[in-house]
C-alpha cells in the first residue's frame, strides 16, 4: 500500500495522539484535524500539519482531504459535552469525513469502533458507532475497522475506587477483559491498515478478571485489596432506570460502561505494556504533582 499522507481525526484525544506519533515515526506526512490549532500546538501535539476544522461542520473541512491517501478517525464522545449527541459526533461527524474522503478519492478510511458492538446495539453510543460502520461498509472505499476491548485510559476508575479504599464490582467479578495501551493500539492500527485488513478485534497482552484488575489497582497504591461484590441485578436495573432519571450526559456513558462490565471484553492479544505498569505510572504521576505543590509555611508563634 503506497500511501504518504494521513489525516487523523480526533488527533488531540488519548488514542489520536498516539496515532499521530506512530505515523510521524514512520515518516508519513501527518495532517491532524483539530478544533483549535493553537491549543493543540501548546498541548504538545507534534504533527506535520495542523488543519483547523470541526467534523461536525462540513463547511470547515474544505481542503482537509487535499492530497490525502488515508483517513484514520477516532472521533467519538465518551462523555457528552457542548450539547452534542452521539449521533452528532460518532455518526454524523464521521459521515461528513467519509463524504469528503469519497469526493477526494481517498484510498482507505480507518475507523476505531468498539469490541462486541453487536451485543450492545441498545446502547446509544454503540448504536451511533455501528450505524457509521454500516455506512462505511456500504461505501465504495477500502476500509479498516479496529475494535479495541478497552483503553488503559478507561481503567482509571478502578484506581480511583481503590484510592478511596474499596472497589465495587457487579456479580462475581470473574468476567475478563484485556485493555490495551494507546501506543500499542496505534501500532496495531498502522499494521492492520498496511496489511489491508477489514476488521481487527484487539486487546492488550494480558487478560485479567475484573477481580484481578481491582487487585492490581490496590497493589499499585500499596493498599490491601478491599472488593465488594454487588448482585448483578443492580447493574441490570441501572441499565433500565438511568435513562429515565438522569440526563443523557450522565446515562449515555454509564449505559456503555455498565453494559461492557456485564460481558467478557477480550480481543486478540497484542502489545507489551501491562495494566499494572499503567497503574504504577498514574500513581507516580499523582505523587510527583503532589510533591511539586508549594509547601505552606506556618507562621511561628510569638514569644511573649
Predicted regions and their residues:
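NAD(P)H-binding glycine-rich loop region in Rossmannoid oxidoreductase-like domains
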Residues: 7, 32-96, 100-103, 118
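Non-catalytic, hydrophobic alpha-helical segments
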Residues: 15, 71, 185, 189, ...
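Glycine-/Pro-rich loop/turn segments that contact NAD(P) or position catalytic residues
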Residues: 77-163
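Substrate-positioning beta->alpha
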Residues: 151, 171-192, 198
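Glycine/proline-rich active-site loop of Rossmann-fold NAD(P)-dependent oxidoreductases
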Residues: 153-160, 191-200, 223-225
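Glycine-rich Rossmann NAD(P)(H)-binding loop
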Residues: 170-175, 200-207, 218-222, 230, ...
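A hydrophobic C-terminal alpha-helical subdomain
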Residues: 232-304
